[in-house]
């Protein structure tokens, strides 16, 4: 990523930024799993600090292009529908405004975050498109018990409103003529962090998310998430991070394979990640990462295990 400050005033600056991210696999057998994201944003940042109080406001308009191959999870080949290749189905252009604000004090901090986006997916006449509107609004409050421990409460509402995807009936069928899908989410989270000395801290997260299918409730769910994180910096050059999470879904109405004979849909997942970095120079670091993800479901189409190992270099300016 790169950011250029266009104009700077005592407490506010205007900027333009570019970010690129993705995954690239050298093995030709895995090239269909390559993903890329390019994002350009323009906005302003306000920051003012006085003694123990600080105020930050960030506003921007962002445009992003995401590209990936819509491939078969069993054999890795490009997906087809009715004999027609639909490998570009998951490519999309995303754009919209965003705003975040934070007020921090010696003990109490609070803030908000808001987004409004349009996601425009690649046209595929033979299958429904994933085009949708996305809205997000969140609030948080944080309290520092001591200089080394804090507790944060977060409330989020977000919504995805599709333009070309019929909603599901209670029998699991997605019939033409049904209203388009609209999913509304309400999440409440709790985070606790504790610092141990200057070089180490750990934290725990708990969150409950309720999704409402606004048609007849077929795809409603309740998701309980539990997470932990640990960070250790024994010196100026070395960093070590460990984090993991467990998610349990409760679908009261949905069926596996969207078929009544498949029985009630169940899903749970576990993720774990280890990241280490060694700073070789002021700007250059060597990094290594291991990532594990396992999803178990009565709908085996979404059940999988994945383990990734990465090694690379990172440049920070």
Whereabouts are the PLM-identified features?
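Gram-negative and organellar
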Residues: 1-317
């Amino acid at each position: 990523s790169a950011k250029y400050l266009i104009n700077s005033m005592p407490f506010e600056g205007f900027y333009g930024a570019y970010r690129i991210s993705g995954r690239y696999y050298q093995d030709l057998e895995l090239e269909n799993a390559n993903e890329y994201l390019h994002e350009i944003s323009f906005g302003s940042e306000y920051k003012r600090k006085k003694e123990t109080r600080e105020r930050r406001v960030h506003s921007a308009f962002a445009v992003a292009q995401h590209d990936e191959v819509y491939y078969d999870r069993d054999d890795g080949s490009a997906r087809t529908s009715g004999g027609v290749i639909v490998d570009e189905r998951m490519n999309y252009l995303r754009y919209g405004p965003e705003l975040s604000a934070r007020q921090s004090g010696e003990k109490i901090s609070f803030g908000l975050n808001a987004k409004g986006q349009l996601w425009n997916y690649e046209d595929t006449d033979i299958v429904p498109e994933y085009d949708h509107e996305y809205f997000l609004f969140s609030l948080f409050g944080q309290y520092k018990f001591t200089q080394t421990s804090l507790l944060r409460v977060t409330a989020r509402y977000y919504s995805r409103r599709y333009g070309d995807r019929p909603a599901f009936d209670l029998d699991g069928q997605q019939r033409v003529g049904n209203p388009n899908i609209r999913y509304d989410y309400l999440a409440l989270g709790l985070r606790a962090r504790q610092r141990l000395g200057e070089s180490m801290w750990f934290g725990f997260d708990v969150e409950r998310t309720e999704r409402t299918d606004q048609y007849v409730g077929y795809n409603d769910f309740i998701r309980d998430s539990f997470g932990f994180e640990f960070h250790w910096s024994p010196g100026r050059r070395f960093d070590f991070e460990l984090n993991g999470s467990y998610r349990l879904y409760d679908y009261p109405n949905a069926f596996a394979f969207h078929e009544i004979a498949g029985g009630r849909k169940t899903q749970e997942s576990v993720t774990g990640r280890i990241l280490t970095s060694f700073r070789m120079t002021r700007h250059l670091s060597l990094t290594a990462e291991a990532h594990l993800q396992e999803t178990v479901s009565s709908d085996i189409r979404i059940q999988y295990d994945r383990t990734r190992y990465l090694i690379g270099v990172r440049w920070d300016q």
